[in-house]
Amino acid sequence: MASGDTLYIATDGSEMPAEIVELHEIEVETIPVETIETTVVGEEEEEDDDDEDGGGGDHGGGGGGHGHAGHHHHHHHHHHHHPPMIALQPLVTDDPTQVHHHQEVILVQTREEVVGGDDSDGLRAEDGFEDQILIPVPAPAGGDDDYIEQTLVTVAAAGKSGGGASSGGGRVKKGGGKKSGKKSYLGGGAGAAGGGGADPGNKKWEQKQVQIKTLEGEFSVTMWSSDEKKDIDHETVVEEQIIGENSPPDYSEYMTGKKLPPGGIPGIDLSDPKQLAEFARMKPRKIKEDDAPRTIACPHKGCTKMFRDNSAMRKHLHTHGPRVHVCAECGKAFVESSKLKRHQLVHTGEKPFQCTFEGCGKRFSLDFNLRTHVRIHTGDRPYVCPFDGCNKKFAQSTNLKSHILTHAKAKNNQ
């Protein structure tokens, strides 16, 4: 702008000619907008897609502002890589074609952490990153696993899941084509912690001393507790329970021969897979004559296990702690290192458990699978249909559950 124009404006009194105002508006002030945009590598997704194992965490930052100055990105993103910590805020613009970019704020926060969700045995701790995304856009179609609320959610952008943001639409979608078998890619689940002791839902774990009252007296135990919810039942004191009084009913006897009452079990709909799973949840236990009654309950809320003595209950308590032993191959997490070592046999192909029946010799990675296999030879079918008039038996509990569903659904249709 000419210096004479500047002096004219400064010396003018109260009013400014319209022509001069127009000259001021011609001086386009878009440099700050473009500067902000060039700090976000908007098209880096194309490079990251070629290396999904390391770039999943950057996907969440590319969607919010791709349409504002995409041609500027093209000149910059090949020359440098920004740190994965990106804060992308919606830009103020009068262009009606860019309104959809006002709908979201994407915060990408990178840290190495075990990430998980619904399936506590399927926690993931890969070399990928964790994105925290605030998204007030409608949840994408595709089932419960893809549902994203309008809140700050944790998305595991691990390489195998390929999770990230779409570069053009301001929406979040799952990438990577085929879905992984894990269900734990949205955080906030009930899983336990790993890595640095932090849970997928940013749950903080601590050990607490809890007083337990029994008929033999009081004693204290150390147990894990998280800040997400009250894991300890009955505040800090757990009274001893006597089986048959306050403890939940044990339905395992119906899985091993006892028939259901004519009217069924009140309050249980066996045609509902969830209720059926609860019905068949407890494994049948062989009762010995010298078996002492199990009178001491686990103090963790939601756990119904009972124990014969204090030491047995103490041994059990650590199973409610953080799952810090993580399989590098698939991301499953375990409380005990021995369980992780046993699980890793599945990936190594090692099969140390061999069937000893003559002429068989089949080998298995897990002892559980061998025990199930042996029933083929022995003819042992310990799982019996509980419906009156049906005497079918099964070698595996899963087969019995499927069979029970056919009875229950047929009964409901009558």
UniProtKB/Swiss-Prot annotation:
There is a cross-link at K182, K183, K208, K230, K286, K288, K409, K411 (Glycyl lysine isopeptide (Lys-Gly) (interchain with G-Cter in SUMO2)). GO terms for biological process: anterior/posterior pattern specification; B cell differentiation; camera-type eye morphogenesis; cellular response to interleukin-1; cellular response to UV; chromatin remodeling; chromosome organization; DNA damage response. Zn(2+) 4 binds at C385, C390, H403, H407. It comes from the Eukaryota. Transiently poly-ADP-ribosylated by PARP1 upon DNA damage, with the effect of decreasing affinity of YY1 to its cognate DNA binding sites. Keywords: Activator, ADP-ribosylation, Cytoplasm, Differentiation, DNA damage, DNA recombination, DNA repair, DNA-binding, Isopeptide bond, Metal-binding, Nucleus, Phosphoprotein, Repeat, Repressor, Spermatogenesis, Transcription, Transcription regulation, Ubl conjugation, Zinc, Zinc-finger. The keyword Transport does not apply. Residues 371-397 are annotated as: Involved in masking transactivation domain. The keyword Nucleus applies. Zn(2+) 1 binds at C298, C303, H316, H320. Disulfide bonds: none annotated. Residues 333-371 are annotated as: Involved in repression of activated transcription. Zn(2+) 3 binds at C355, C360, H373, H377. GO terms for cellular component: chromatin; chromatin silencing complex; cytoplasm; Ino80 complex; nuclear matrix; nucleoplasm; nucleus; PcG protein complex. InterPro entries: YY1-like, Znf_C2H2_sf, Znf_C2H2_type. A zinc finger (C2H2-type) spans 296-320, 325-347, 353-377, 383-407. Residues 68-83, 171-182 have a biased composition (Basic residues). GO terms for molecular function: chromatin binding; DNA binding; DNA-binding transcription activator activity, RNA polymerase II-specific; DNA-binding transcription factor activity; DNA-binding transcription factor binding; DNA-binding transcription repressor activity, RNA polymerase II-specific; four-way junction DNA binding; RNA binding. Residues 32-83, 159-203 are annotated as: Disordered. Disruption phenotype: Spermatocytes have a significant decrease in the global level of the heterochromatin markers and increase in the chromosomal double-strand break (DSB) signals at the leptotene/zygotene stages. Residues 42-55 have a biased composition (Acidic residues). Zn(2+) 2 binds at C327, C330, H343, H347. Belongs to the YY transcription factor family. Interacts with YAF2 through the region encompassing the first and second zinc fingers. Component of the chromatin remodeling INO80 complex; specifically part of a complex module associated with the DBINO domain of INO80. Interacts with EED and EZH2; the interactions are indicative for an association with the PRC2/EED-EZH2 complex. Found in a complex with SMAD1 and SMAD4. Interacts with SFMBT2. Found in a complex with YY1, SIN3A and HDAC1. This is Transcriptional repressor protein YY1. It comes from Mus musculus. The gene is Yy1.
